Design a protein with these regions (language model features):
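A flexible loop/linker signature enriched in serine peptidases of the S9 family
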Residues: 176, 188-198, 214-217, 234-243, ...
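Short loop/turn segments that connect beta-strands within beta-propeller blades
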Residues: 203-207, 247-251, 291-295, 335-339, ...
Length: 459
């Protein structure tokens, strides 16, 4: 019995235990190797905001370049220097240096410590102003505007840079941004035989890294709620794996139910009102759904095989999970209400297998867009991060390494973060990759790091 429970936990943690036609837009789904040339001069600074303007401009440039979809023009090449938020730029000067888009902005700092930015995005080739969809602060309605503006406390100045970068990214790609968000992960330190694992959090670009726990107990697989203020994770506190909630507002931790056996592999439902998880009892692992308000649970699977690593679809109607009911770890999909569904094979069942390739599949996670499921695959001695359609079609492997594990989606469903060990004995590091399999980047952390999870865009 203990052996089957340990296998269930290993399946769950995977290998870690071993616009207008004339306007320019970026298509980020076709895998183009040519990034959009964009000029972002330092924003003009009001009194006392000179350093803030420089820093905010730098973060905006770094955010956009980090996606691999933009190339910033070297400021040394700029011809026009007398830019103003209220004046049309000399487009010919920017065409000469091959810029397709131009961002002009201003930063001010008032006596109450509030930072404000105002910016415009210009289509250099089309010779016109990009219109932005913004939320009117008076009516709370979305309206079209010739530019964007944000206000925030000085201590949170990086957020105003990320928000501005998100607005630029959204206007030029057509997709939601990802920069004004956070990543929670497991910070690892110490020798392999006595590893200290702490819950940690940072901005999407690696800034403002903070440890949330002290590392007295082993912690795995943190996951964000849709409110971005709660994290669920598995901890070995008390000597057995159990699912916990961590409140980011007050730092309070609590056990999610006093279940017999072990609970692990937690993940929030899309509406944030429930947590789906695995429970191992009497040698068997099945899936359960807990209502966070009533703390009532409902059993989702009842099968002698190991069912683990559940993840709900964007609309909450379905669950994907890993099961060895077919003889090896594979990915399955079921309806959340337990009703039968039509499988890719044409028959009906309560759970349909959607992976049939060589190797073992684990850690499936549904895209927030609803169209893809990311997974870890082990085949021929290598590990891969991949994606597959929810109907089992179009499997694509995006990465390959000695160990790649734990995929997690960006808020817009266009980027996947995961952790990698490049060789035996190497500590885990966080990486991200886009859906084209390009733009593989290491996310810098102060320690070794594993089990990343991306928050929604911050409120």
């Amino acid at each position: 019995m203990l052996k089957r429970i340990l296998v269930a936990v290993m399946l769950f943690v995977g290998a870690s235990l071993s616009g207008v036609q004339a306007q320019i837009e970026v298509d980020i789904t076709r895998g183009s190797d040519t990034p959009l040339p964009i000029a972002i001069p330092d924003f003009k600074a009001g009194p006392g905001a000179e350093e803030l303007a420089r820093q905010i401009s730098e973060v905006i440039r770094n955010d956009l370049v980090s996606t691999g979809r933009f190339k910033t023009i070297d400021p040394a090449a700029f011809i026009q220097k007398d830019l103003s938020i209220s004046l049309q730029p000399r487009f010919a000067d920017w065409r000469i240096i091959n810029s397709d888009a131009l961002v002009v902005g201003e930063v001010s700092l008032d006596s109450d410590g509030i930072v404000s930015t105002v910016f415009r995005i210009w289509d250099v080739q089309g010779g016109e102003l990009y219109r932005l969809t913004v939320r009117d602060s008076a009516t709370d309605q979305l309206v079209e505007s010739g530019g964007g503006n944000f206000r925030i406390n000085k201590d949170d100045w990086r957020r105003i840079a990320h928000k501005t970068a998100d607005a630029i990214y959204t206007r030029l790609t057509g997709d939601d941004g990802i920069f004004d968000s956070r990543i929670v992960y497991i910070a690892e330190s110490g020798p392999k035989t006595n590893r200290v694992k702490r819950l940690a959090i940072m901005d999407s670009d690696g800034a403002n890294q903070v440890f949330l726990t002290e590392g007295r107990n082993r912690i795995l697989t943190p996951r964000f709620s849709t409110s971005d203020q709660e994290i669920t994770y598995m901890s070995f506190e008390g000597g057995r794996p159990r699912v916990y909630l961590f409140n980011l507002r007050n730092g309070r931790q609590e056990v999610l139910g006093n279940f017999p056996g072990m609970t692990f592999a937690p993940r929030f439902s899309p509406d944030g009102r429930s947590v789906v998880m695995s429970q191992a009892l009497n040698g068997n692992s099945d899936l359960y759904l807990m209502d966070l308000r009533t703390r009532q649970t409902r059993r989702l699977t009842d099968h002698p095989a190991i069912d683990t690593s559940p993840s709900m679809s964007a609309d909450g109607s379905q669950v994907t999970f890993t099961s060895d009911r077919g003889g090896s770890p594979q990915i399955y999909v079921m309806n959340t209400d337990g009703s039968p569904l039509t499988c890719p094979s044409g028959g009906q069942d309560k759970a349909c297998r959607i992976t049939f390739g060589r190797g073992n599949y684990s850690t499936p996670v549904w895209s927030p867009r609803g169209d893809l499921i990311a997974f870890t695959k082990q085949v021929r001695g290598k590990f891969h991060i991949g994606v597959i359609g929810t109907d089992g079609q179009g499997e694509r492997l995006l990465s390959e390494a000695y160990l790649d594990e734990g995929p997690a989606w960006s808020p817009n469903g266009r980027v996947i973060t995961f952790f990698r060990e490049s060789r035996p004995g190497a500590g885990p590091k966080l990486y991200s990759i886009d859906l084209t399999g390009r733009n593989l980047r290491q996310l810098q952390t102060t320690t070794d790091a594993s089990d990343p999870a991306w928050s929604p865009l911050l409120k």
